[in-house]
């Protein structure tokens, strides 16, 4: 096991934009990973201009950028992850941590943690569909309401794929 300390930049909406990530890397040196503020899969339209600016490969040159996906639908996650892979991204991140009320009430972000059966099905579907194609990491909270929820969350995907 590699015990080297890794440094990652978490996304902060409207702060850690592509311009900020590039300036940070140039001034302070590159971190190991930069997580891009979340994208949501769109079925009926292309990316918003702001989203497109964040994921354009030329805006993420010379850094290891990881797009973050916010959804509770495996089909949308899989489709978006494959599109991001085609753009050159090696890894995507599932956002299970966002505490925003508008996100949580839709069962996304940390709101998805309250539905362990659905979450387990979702995780199985995305890991099975994307195995060997793109790396998937997960940003989560230790529970939706209580830290005691964490052990059960860990059991959802305890086997390594």
Language-model regions, residue ranges each:
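Glycine-rich, positively charged N-terminal anion/phosphate-binding segment
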Residues: 12-83
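Glycine-rich, proline-tolerant flexible connector loops at the mouths of alpha/beta enzymes
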Residues: 40-45, 96-116
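Generic structural signal for well-ordered alpha-helices
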Residues: 21, 81-82, 116-127, 150-155
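Hydrophobic faces of well-ordered beta-strands that scaffold small-molecule active sites
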Residues: 7-10, 34-36, 65-69, 92-94, ...
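Conserved small/polar residues in nucleotide/adenosyl-binding loops
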Residues: 160-161
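Active-site glycine- and acidic-residue-rich loops that bind
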Residues: 14, 75-76, 135, 140-154
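Glycine-rich anion/phosphate-binding loops
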Residues: 66-89, 111-121, 147
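Alpha-helix-loop-beta-strand connector modules within alpha/beta enzyme cores
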Residues: 55-66, 110-137
């Amino acid at each position: 096991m590699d015990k080297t300390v890794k440094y990652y930049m978490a996304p902060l909406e409207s702060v850690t934009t592509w311009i900020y990530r590039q300036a940070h890397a140039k001034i302070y040196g590159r971190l190991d990973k930069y997580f891009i503020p979340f994208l949501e899969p769109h079925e009926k339209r292309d990316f918003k201009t702001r989203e497109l600016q964040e994921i354009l490969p030329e805006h993420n040159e010379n850094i290891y950028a990881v797009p973050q996906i916010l959804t509770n639908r495996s089909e949308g996650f899989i489709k978006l992850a494959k599109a991001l892979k085609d753009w050159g991204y090696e890894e995507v991140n599932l956002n299970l941590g966002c505490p925003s009320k508008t996100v949580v009430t839709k069962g996304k972000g940390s709101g998805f943690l309250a539905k362990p059966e659905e979450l387990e099905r979702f995780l199985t579907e995305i890991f099975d569909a994307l195995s060997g194609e793109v790396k998937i990491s997960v940003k989560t909270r230790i529970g939706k309401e209580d830290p005691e929820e964490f052990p059960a969350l860990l059991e959802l995907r305890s086997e390594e794929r």
